[in-house]
A protein has these predicted regions:
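Glycine-rich phosphate/pyrophosphate-handling loop used in enzymes and phosphotransfer proteins
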Residues: 1-121
């Protein structure tokens, strides 16, 4: 066991990393969100639909090429904690983690292959 592993294990005991969705302690291999919550995340799949509900929302109001969202936000839903942690609890690393997850799906779908910029809202 390396010093880094011992140090991280000690940190996990003293300051356990908690899943923002279900408040369970994260396993050593989990990053930011536990495996169960990642599996159950209410993904929109808007990136698989041309002129999806989000694009319809912006149509005629804002000049956009495409619009999408990673997961459904519903007030009171435990997944709303992800957004709250980003906005109010200074958790930029959680944002990078979620953005990377969704970016992999977007790249695989080709949905944004002709887009120069993505603006997170």
């Amino acid at each position: 066991m390396t010093f880094k592993n011992i140090y991280n294990a000690l940190l996990d005991v003293l300051f356990p990393r908690i899943c923002p969705v279900c408040d369970s302690v994260l396993a050593s291999h989990e990053q930011h969100i536990c495996t169960k919550c990642l599996t159950d995340i209410p993904i929109t799949r808007y990136h698989t639909d041309k002129f999806n509900a989000m694009e319809q929302l912006f149509a005629g109001k804002v000049p956009i090429e495409h619009a999408t969202g990673f997961f459904f936000y519903e007030k009171g839903n435990p997944y709303a904690n992800i957004i709250h942690d980003l906005k109010y609890r200074n958790q930029p690393q959680l944002g990078r983690f979620v953005a990377t997850l969704y970016a992999k799906q977007l790249v695989a779908s080709g949905y944004f292959s002709d887009i120069d910029y993505i603006i997170p809202v």
